[in-house]
Amino acid sequence: MARPAPPDLSDSRRPLRGVARSYPAGHRVDAHEHAWGQVLYAVSGMMWLETPDEALPVPPQRAVWLPPSLRHAVRVASELQMRNIYLSPELSRGLEDRTLVLVVGPLLRELIVSLVEQERQSDPDYYRALADLAVLELGRARRSSLRVPLPDASDRRLLALCQAVMANPSLDIGLERLAEDAGASVRTLSRLFQRSLGMGFADWRRQVQLATASAALIDGRPVAGIAHALGYTPSAFSDMFRRELGVSPTEYRAEHHQPFQP
């Protein structure tokens, strides 16, 4: 699917540009790159940010930082309202040169929204002051550690299977079903997962499930509904979640959920 054009990045007086976008569930922005850094802020809904070697879940009220010239794609998991800001190479030097999923606090949220809303209205000096403060807040924001490894893009068959699992990580879809869809044997796919990702299919899918569940909990969704969507009973899901992350789903939601703020 064609990607939307970024805003005009040629005005040197404005080293940060902002734009608001919305996408339906299932939408995909194909892989691309640009010379400016980018922050994608999920106001509501969830997206997956895919780079050449990993996928990062971006739940509501979270943002992802992309350094300049990093090839990336976006897959929308649920109806998405987002705010994007583009940072010039000069401003981007104040931030890390790797992708980061950030917890968006009240001040950073207001800065991102203001930078988008006032993109064409504020005078350059005022806008630059907002941009400098936003960079400081981005550097101070708390980070998320949830990441899912992806195979090399040259392995198109395995990458397509991984993307299918990310779209529906339920236990109901096993390696046998994936092998049948791919026209390969279970043994062949097992070897591909181990060789390309350093782990077996079950372990990799569990990482996807944890990322998906964590995003849903941050969004305030009920534990039973999340468990059912992933193919678990509520008790089995809670046991798996606690075993992997050290806290129960309810405890995780209480710590991380942020009420929706448009």
Short names for language-model regions:
Residues 69-99:
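Ligand-binding loop in jelly-roll beta-barrel domains
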Residues 1-46:
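Generic protein-terminus/edge-of-domain signal
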Residues 119-182, 195-207:
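Short, Lys/Arg-enriched, Trp-marked, Pro/Gly-tolerant hinge/linker segments that flank
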Residues 193-200, 240-252:
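A secondary-structure capping/hinge motif
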Residues 53-68:
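Short acidic-glycine-tyrosine-enriched beta hairpin
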